[in-house]
Every structure is written in structure tokens, then in C-alpha cells.
């Protein structure tokens, strides 16, 4: 099915019935937004817990180890997401990929995919995203398609960005993208008002207080 044919002028919102992976794609001006939702169901939690390693072959030919659950969740919707992006894309369009928690992990995996298919670096914004790549090849594959505006927001008291702890084989594996730490009030403000007031949460640095 050509999913975007259903929503020529509306956001495309699809829920995967197999792994409960939720995503949405919409276009505003010359920017295409791709958003993945976080953990909210038993199926989502099962994907979080599948923390063994699974191989991914990057577009540059390198092979890297990824979190098996996050890979499974993303691959269940991958073709639909790319199909929708292709149908919305016009020459000159840019991409912003967004995700919270489990959705942040899926956004990380989508970054290499979308960047390679559309031959551009994109803006990646994650909130409370867990670790996805086990090795440097994975880090490099994803970072190759991230532009300088990419950000990784974390609540300093949130344990999720530190998991799975055994994926931290070197400092580069801990975070992909520039980390911004926030207190709970600031994070709530960004999550509820960020896309409207703060251009998806990375435009106003005064919101964030470093607690590292």
C-alpha cells in the first residue's frame, strides 16, 4: 500500500499491530518531520527488554551490533516510513527526525536510513533515548547523517539514557548527538511546548540547567 496516498494534506499516523510501533510523518513548509513514540504498552516493553545484540549492515558496508529489540521495532515500520517520506518529498526539502524513549532509539536507526536514501544530513532530536549501538561502527553510521543541530535531551534523574549499561564500550557509545541535561520542569515544558515555542526543543538554551 502507498500509505501517503491516504493523507495527501494530513499527517500520516500509523500504528504497527505486530510490535506496537507508532510513528507519524508530516510536512510543514520545506521540512518533513518523522516522529516515533516511546514505550506505552506491554509489546513496547518487550522490545525494550530484548537487549541482546543484532547485526546491522550499514550503507557504507560496515557491520555493527545494535539493540535487537529496537532494531525489530524499527524494521517493522521501516518500509512504510520510507515510502511515506518518498511520497512527501520534493526537491529542497529537509528532514527532522524526533523520538522519545523507545521512539528515540527508533529515530536513531531511522537517521541513517533516511539520510542515505535522500542523500542529506538531517536534524535528529531525541528525548530520554536509550543506547542503540554497541560499537563504533554503529556510532559512525548514524553520525554520518546527522547535522550540527542534532540534540539528545535528557532528564538528569532518568535512568533510561544509561541503558543498556553494557552497551557503553567506550565514551562515544554513551550518547549520539550533543547531550543537553534538564530538570523535570524544563523537560516537561519542552515536551509539551517545544515544537511550537522552541522549534522542537533545541532553540532556547536558557531552559536547560546542567546537572552533570
Identify the residue ranges that each predicted region occupies.
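Short, surface-exposed "cap/lid" segments of acyl-processing enzymes
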Residues: 13-60
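Extended, Lys/Arg-enriched charged tracts that mediate electrostatic binding to polyanionic substrates
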Residues: 1-17
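Active-site loop->helix "elbow" adjoining a glycine-rich segment at hydrolase catalytic centers
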Residues: 101-106
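Serine hydrolase/lipase
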Residues: 3-4, 22, 30-31, 57-60, ...
Amino acid at each position: 500500500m502507498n500509505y501517503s496516498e491516504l493523507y495527501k494534506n494530513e499527517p500520516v499516523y500509523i500504528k504497527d499491530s505486530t510490535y506496537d510501533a507508532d510513528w507519524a510523518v508530516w510536512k510543514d513548509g520545506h521540512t518533513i518531520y518523522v516522529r516515533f513514540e516511546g514505550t506505552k504498552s506491554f509489546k513496547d516493553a518487550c522490545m525494550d527488554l530484548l537487549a541482546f545484540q543484532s547485526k546491522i549492515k550499514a550503507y557504507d558496508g560496515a557491520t555493527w551490533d545494535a539493540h535487537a529489540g529496537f532494531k525489530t521495532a524499527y524494521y517493522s515500520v521501516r518500509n512504510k516510513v520510507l515510502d511515506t517520506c518518498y511520497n512527501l518529498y520534493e526537491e529542497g526539502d529537509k528532514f527532522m527526525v524526533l523520538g522519545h524513549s523507545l521512539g528515540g532509539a527508533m529515530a536513531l536507526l531511522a537517521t541513517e536510513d533516511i539520510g542515505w536514501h535522500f542523500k542529506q544530513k538531517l536534524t535528529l532530536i531525541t528525548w530520554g533515548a536509550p543506547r542503540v549501538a554497541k560499537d563504533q561502527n554503529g556510532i559512525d553510521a548514524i553520525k554520518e547523517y546527522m547535522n550540527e543541530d542534532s540534540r539528545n535531551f535528557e532528564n538528569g534523574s532518568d535512568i533510561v539514557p544509561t541503558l543498556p549499561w553494557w552497551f557503553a564500550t567506550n565514551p562515544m557509545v554513551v550518547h549520539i548527538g550533543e547531550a543537553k541535561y534538564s530538570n523535570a520542569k524544563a523537560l516537561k515544558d519542552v515536551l509539551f511546548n517545544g515544537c511550537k515555542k522552541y522549534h522542537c526543543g533545541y532553540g532556547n538554551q536558557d531552559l536547560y540547567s546542567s546537572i552533570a
